[in-house]
Amino acid sequence: MNSYKHPLRVGVGGPVGSGKTALLEALCKAMRDTWQLAVVTNDIYTKEDQRILTEAGALAPERIVGVETGGCPHTAIREDASMNLAAVEALSEKFGNLDLIFVESGGDNLSATFSPELADLTIYVIDVAEGEKIPRKGGPGITKSDFLVINKTDLAPYVGASLEVMASDTQRMRGDRPWTFTNLKQGDGLSTIIAFLEDKGMLGK
């Protein structure tokens, strides 16, 4: 019987360049003094995101593990999540007292989802620079994720995107499911995401 604590597992997905790694860096730095954290990153042929988070000092290096999927990033979080499951278990056993493990997917598209065996909660990240039409395009990441992040609000004036239109479309596509705008450079929206994780993830309960 496993003697270590079973942490909350949070899948973080979204297209390449949407800000997944930046979000993880911000979340880790904001939460690490309160909760015991670790991160599993996914890249196809490298461990680039692991390196970025480590060099940014998001967490101690031994708390950040990179998985090289060697193929389609969707498969590693959905159909065959064995490498990620093994990394999560190894971290859980190594530290024994983890409260939360973030699992960052490789760059994916709007149809990618996490296996329920791998993630207890899912956060999906899109960004304003992709255009104001992105929320209404739908897809499981936008409509079914437990929490949707619309990042880079500071770029809206430069790409001609209306945050009001994006908010209206997001509300229509998601119904009661929570979401927020973020500008991670300024920390805008971060507290909303943390409150969601602590509440829905029942951290400390």
From Swiss-Prot:
Protein source organism: Klebsiella aerogenes (Enterobacter aerogenes)
Protein name: Urease accessory protein UreG
GO terms for MF: GTP binding; GTPase activity; nickel cation binding
Cysteine pairings via disulfide bonds: none
Main function: Facilitates the functional incorporation of the urease nickel metallocenter. This process requires GTP hydrolysis, probably effectuated by UreG.
Binding residues for GTP: 14-21
Signal peptide: none
Family: Belongs to the SIMIBI class G3E GTPase family. UreG subfamily.
Presence of keyword Chaperone: yes
Activity regulation remarks: Activation of apourease within the UreDFG-apoprotein complex is inhibited by zinc, copper and cobalt.
GO annotations of cellular component type: cytoplasm
Record localization: Cytoplasm
Keyword Kinase: no
GO biological processes: urea catabolic process
Keyword terms of this UniProt record: Chaperone, Cytoplasm, GTP-binding, Nickel insertion, Nucleotide-binding
Superkingdom field: Bacteria
Assembly and interaction partners: Homodimer. UreD, UreF and UreG form a complex that acts as a GTP-hydrolysis-dependent molecular chaperone, activating the urease apoprotein by helping to assemble the nickel containing metallocenter of UreC. The UreE protein probably delivers the nickel.
